[in-house]
Amino acid sequence: MGEVQREKVAVIIGPTAVGKTKLSIDLAKALNGEIVSGDSMQIYRTMDIGTAKVTTDEMDGIPHYMIDIKDPEDSFSVAEFQESVRKCIREITERGKLPIIVGGTGLYIQSVLFDYQFTDEAGDATYREQMEKLALEHGVEYVHKKLQEVDPESAERIHANNVRRVIRALEIFHTTGEKMSNQLEKQENELLYDVSLIGLTMDREMLYDRINLRVNLMIEQGLLEEVKGLHERGVRDCQSIQAIGYKEIYDYFENRVSLEEAVSQLKTNSRRYAKRQLTWFRNKMDVGWFDVTDGEKTSEILRYIEGKLQLKSNNSK
């Protein structure tokens, strides 16, 4: 018997504001593809501006998945994301189309592509409650520091504001004596798909300028009104509100900072996130990097994917 044919998947990664959205749509048109969002925050309805969600006009008729599937009050674990995206890949492939994942969130994308197993076996409800209480009494940074002490790799990857995941990593260490990062490292070697990974990068100063401009544009487009709607609706302490662009504006609405300080912090956090995204992808995955400082590289990237996945684009006919 021959080897089972693995499903082909193209993945576009890179820091926020680097130009992934336009490239993904150009590639989808050329490669008969459909797009799956690999951004863990674009799943939330009504959170459009702050997540830089693709608009209907930008989609230009290309089907998009994993967008607007949950309410902001809902949680959505990496395991649920993994299951949902794999289902999208299966269905898109069955239609004779190429799945194109656009990200996004490093761990989430990695969990889809590699043979990650998520288990709830390691659990200690009493310990979890203790950590939740400590987070309430002493703040999220306190429990994040505890994680830094026992599992610095996970602490680097998990933002302090993502309390649920911080406590989960602590709980795994407490229960098994093993770092969560070690458990994941053991599992991530085998790719489940025939993958072409495309990474976009650009000159850091130019990228940071683009991020600052994007934040200014978000404010002009109505980010304050979008966040105010969530705030007035009573959305609090949810996974969704930990997203960059929301937690900073929440601080403004709750009179902890001025609007100027909130916007400045949003820009700073966005730049830091972009740096973390690049570090993650460079350390974890075999990526074909394309520097788009001097402009788009769509034709070059198209040829790269065609070669990697042994495909013919509409442009090649």
Swiss-Prot record:
The keyword Transferase applies. It holds the Pfam family IPPT. It comes from the Bacteria. Substrate binds at residues 16-21. SUPFAM superfamilies: P-loop containing nucleoside triphosphate hydrolases. Keywords: ATP-binding, Magnesium, Nucleotide-binding, Transferase, tRNA processing. The record marks 105, 128 as: Interaction with substrate tRNA. InterPro entries: Dimethylallyltransferase, IPT, P-loop_NTPase. ATP binds at residues 14-21. It catalyses: adenosine(37) in tRNA + dimethylallyl diphosphate = N(6)-dimethylallyladenosine(37) in tRNA + diphosphate. Its cofactor is Mg(2+). GO terms for molecular function: ATP binding; tRNA dimethylallyltransferase activity. GO terms for biological process: tRNA modification. Residues 39-42 are annotated as: Interaction with substrate tRNA. Its EC number is 2.5.1.75. Catalyzes the transfer of a dimethylallyl group onto the adenine at position 37 in tRNAs that read codons beginning with uridine, leading to the formation of N6-(dimethylallyl)adenosine (i(6)A). Belongs to the IPP transferase family. Monomer. This is tRNA dimethylallyltransferase. The gene is miaA.
